[in-house]
Amino acid sequence: MKYKYWLACMAQMAENIGTGKVEKLFRFAGSAGVLYDMSEKEFMQIPGITEADVKSVLTYKKAWNLEEAWENLKRSGLYLVTREDENYPKRLLYINKPPYGIFYK
């Protein structure tokens, strides 16, 4: 789940990366964990992802302490639901560029 958290946050905070590109990245990798572990060379093979996008993803990944952020989220009492989860609001799947993840309390 922590990799889904990373992906949901990246969709909102990483430069040049939004919901549409997160969708492309996720479809290519098949899971947030696989995506997190991908190399620069692997990212460059994703159709529709530019060199600037790859740089943004890798910069965000390097600058963000995932373990610390994940522990902070768990302590905060907030929860995350992503598109792959059963309890993701089904109606959101029908809008243009639905959010990858939603935080709730």
Functional labels for PLM-detected ranges:
Residues 1-105:
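Short, positively charged patches
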